[in-house]
Amino acid sequence: MWRDVRYSSVTCFHTQIACWLACQIFLVFHPHTAPRRGHQLKVFDTGSGKTAKPSLEKADETQVEDVNQLNVVGSEDPLDTLPPPPTLSAEEERKLWRKIDLKLMPILTLMYLFSFLDRGNIGNAKLDGLQTQLNLVGNEYNIALTMYFVPYCLFECPANLVLKKFRPSKWLPGITVVWGIVMTLMGLVKTYPELVGVRVCLGVAEAGLFPGVVYYLSLWYPRHMLQWRVGLFYGAASIAGAFSGLLAFGINFMSGTRGLLGWSWIFILEGIATVCVGLLAFTVLVDFPATSRFLTPDERAFVIWRKKYDNSSVGEEEHFEMRHLVQAVTDWQVWLHILIYMSIVGPLYGITLFLPTIIKDFGHNVPISQLLTVPPYVFATTVLLIFAYWSDRTKMRFPFILAGQLMCLIGFSINISNAPSGVKYFGVFLCVAGSYAAFPGIISWLGNNLSGQYKRGVGMALHIGIGNFAGAIASNIYRTQDAPRFIIGHGCELMFVGIGLITLPIAVITYKRINHRRDEVTRAALEKGETNLYTPRELREMGDRAPDFRYTL
């Protein structure tokens, strides 16, 4: 029945080619053999209309066998076998996840804080003399912003595949050190071409962090525990916005030290701090659950089992095949979610890169403008964490994404109007909070609804990589000549939000219809007592199209 449902999408040819080449290189490093057939499991055949009553005869045995056979690609010392997963009480399970949180989240959050700080501090540097000293005229400043996003978007998909080869504990800290060095060198640029060149290098170096960390977290946490972690991780971005304003205010007093203006010291000091964080991450970060020595063998088995059988009776596929790439590129939900992603990331980058300028045009001087960027980000961090917590508690994503979109709609509508500056500053709070608070939900939502490690990895990289081109657009819509109302800039942001308000209901309605139809097929099968056999391998290959998979709303 379900095989009769067909979806079509417009794909980006160059992105497919880049991903295909990356996958071919990946396969050279990771030859694999086909998994052996496991126990047969009675399930519903939603493609042919034949149904079967689920059987528990082999379920536990099959799960234990799959956990024991798990081979972790990319680890130096892979564990071929693991003990059967232990039975944990609710309190013991909470302690285990807390143990994992304390190991993973602090360093990942710190790394992303500096990542967002380093990409967005150019907005503060602009007020501290960057544009004047480098003689940037016309749209040169906007072009410098845009050139960051081009390699950042293009390299995100290949970077997620490379992560599996070089291991998270080496790849993520390594790129952190590299972009920290690039950021330090940005403080020494003397001309516009040098600034553009360094921004391009920064985009290349930072491309692998965000999609890599989100994919990495999806390998550790069940899907309805993911948004809170992504929220904690991404909360560093909003904290970075507040931190950037405070740092810029303080560093401004160093202007003239050793012949460098304040904008140079912003880049140099924050770049050096990033390098230190990257070096620290080499000693702290771990790889995959099956090779993590801070967990006991029983704890590793439980984490793998809990994640592997999350919303699936037979678990996810662990090996790579070219069809995973094809499935990700041709999946309707990836392309629909890209539009939803753009509806938030466009406003997010627009307000992040130009907030100091927008506030300055309210009539404040430079130091006060830097300080006034702090409260909106503090408010945004609070709203983000509230949204993330309740989204995981309710196991729903779209209501919180919708709330963020509506906040952006109201905030940008206020700022495009002739309202007094105090009212517009209130609108800024809504713009910042709405875009930042909705973002983790968008990322987690697609990750929840893509089944299979490699399909999820490629799909999420496409989602983030292509969606981030909205950031390139946002970096060009706030022009100096449009101050103080920035009608074009705020108008484009309202356009992005409008796209989201159209595509979000489409996704929700489609997911509901699919879930409802699968429930009906299940109910009819139980009533008729009809059976059909699928092997665990066949169910794993079906992934999120399997009859027992339910989409998160």
Predicted regions and their residues:
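Extracytoplasmic gate region of multi-pass secondary transporters
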Residues: 328-382
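Extracellular/periplasmic helix-loop-helix junction of adjacent transmembrane segments
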Residues: 123-152
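Intracellular terminal tails of multi-pass secondary transporters
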Residues: 2-6, 12, 19, 25-114, ...
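Conserved MFS/SLC helix-loop-helix module at the cytosolic interface between two early adjacent transmembrane helices
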Residues: 154-189
